[in-house]
Amino acid sequence: MRSKHVVLLVSVAGLAVTAGCRSNDTTGPNSGNTLDLSSLIGEMGMATLGASSGVAGVGAVGGFAVPAMPPVVPSTCQYSASIQGFTCAPFTSNGITVNATLFLLDAAGHFQSQPDAATTAAIRNVTDVQGTMKFDQSGTGGSVTLTSHQDLTLSGLLTDTHVLNGSSTSHSDLTVTGTSALHGVTDTKTVTANVTVSKSSRWPTAGTVTSDATTSSQIGSVSVAGTTHSVLTFNGSSVVTMTTTITTGSTPFSSTCKIDLSGAAVPVCN
C-alpha cells in the first residue's frame, strides 16, 4: 500500500489547457465583432478539466498546489506572418513561464490572419510551459521543475457541434525537504480524443482524455517506480467517470472515480 501511495503522491496533474499569456499589444485577432475566440478557448479548457486532478482550474504536483495560469486573451496576441499564427507574449508566475500560440484555420485547413464566423472552421492552441516553482507549506519545503507541451485543436466551428482533439507531454522533477523528504520524476503523455461540445449542452457530451505516466521516486532508502493509466469519459453531464490503474512492480491497483467538473462535490472513488 505504501508504494501505491508514493506513485500517487508524485504523479503530475495536467496543466490547464487554457494556460496562456498576457500582453499590452492589441493587434491580435479581434473576437468582438466576428468570432468569439475567448468563448472557444473556454470550451477547450472545459473539455479537459478534471482529467488529472478532478478540481476545476487547479493543478497539483506531489500534493502541492500549482497556481492556475490565466486563460489566453485573444486580443493580446499578435499575428506573425512567418508562422501564420498569433504569438502571445510570455507570462510568468511563481517561476513558471507559459508561451502560447493560436492558429485559425478554414474548412480546407488553410491558416487565417483574422477570425471570420463565416469561414473559420477550427482553432488550434499550442502551449509550452517551463520553469521551477519553490514552495513552503506547513514546514515542508522544496521545488518542482516543470516542462510541458500541449497541442489542441477545436474543430467544427461552422456547426453547432465542436470537437476537441490533441495531445500533450509533460515532465516534472519534484524535490521535497523536511520530515516528508522525497524526490520524484514523472513523465506523462495525454491524448484528447473526440471530446464533443454541443451548443445545447453545457458539458462535453462525448469523448475521452487518456493519460499515461511513468514515475520514479525516492523516499529515504525506499525506491519506487511505477506507471499510471487513466481514462476520463464525458457523457453530457457535469459528473464524469475516470478509471485509473496504477502499477508498481507487478501489482496493479485500479479505481473508478466520479468527478463533478462544476466543483459542487468532491470526487467519489471506489
Question: For each predicted feature, which ranges?
Answer:
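Bacterial N-terminal signal peptides that target proteins for export
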Residues: M1-L8
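Hydrophobic helical h-region of N-terminal Sec-dependent signal peptides
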Residues: S11-A13
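C-terminal motif of bacterial Sec signal peptides marking the signal peptidase cleavage site
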Residues: V17-G20
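Low-complexity, intrinsically disordered segments exposed to solvent
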Residues: R22-N270
